[in-house]
Structure formats: C-alpha cells, structure tokens
Amino acid sequence: MKRNFAPISEELERLAKISVNAAYQVHSTLGPGLLESVYEVCMMHEFAKAGVKAERQLAVPVLYDGVLLDAALKVDILVDGKLILELKAVEQIAPVHKAQIITYLKLTDRRLGLLINFNVPVIKDGTKRIVCG
C-alpha cells in the first residue's frame, strides 16, 4: 500500500537550496581531502553569511522505554531548526551513512535531510537528499 505524504514545504526547500549552495561554495574553495570538522565549520560560516540560523553538533536524545536517554548521538548541522545535514568526508557513502541520517530524521521528527560527502571531485555527486515520512 502506497502512503501519501504532504509535499516538502517551500521553506524547507529554500533551506535545502541554501544548504546545497553553501556546500558548493565550501567544496569549490577547499576541495576534497579535509576532515569533516573543517567542512562543518566552513558550512556554519556560510550560513552566518547568508543570515540563516544553524546549530552544529546538536544532541539527539533517544526515547526508549518511556525514558529520554542521552545516547551520544549528534546531528552535524541543524539548519533553522528544520533541516538536518549529515556531513561526511569519506571515499564512498555507505548504507550505514544513509541509515544514520534516516534515524536522525525519525528521532527528531523531521522530514528532510541532506547527506553531503565532501570527499568527491564534484560536490553534486556527493549530495544525497533524504526524505522521511
């Protein structure tokens, strides 16, 4: 049975576009080969320049057995409280990376995330859009 979901809001699409543009700018300037943390700080700078609120290394609590637990999960970047960015600097995106961002989306009750791998020749090829019901 196919489920029908509401489309992604225009505001969320706008934030996704800003995020993709920021990743392009960072990658164009620095290229591949650096640590994730470097790309993360540079992405935060791009968001600040664009006047977009973003938080980094935001804790994701886990509700288990009716108890809110600190499981040491952290979202790389949360853009305007709505869009999750998971940044990587790996040779290849693995299924576990996609599972990670899907889990973050579910645990935080958010719909859209971007999985961005900076260790690619062309950033477009390293950017994956993940939509969660």
Where do the language-model regions lie?
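A structural signal for short, well-ordered beta-strand segments
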Residues: 58-60, 75-77, 127
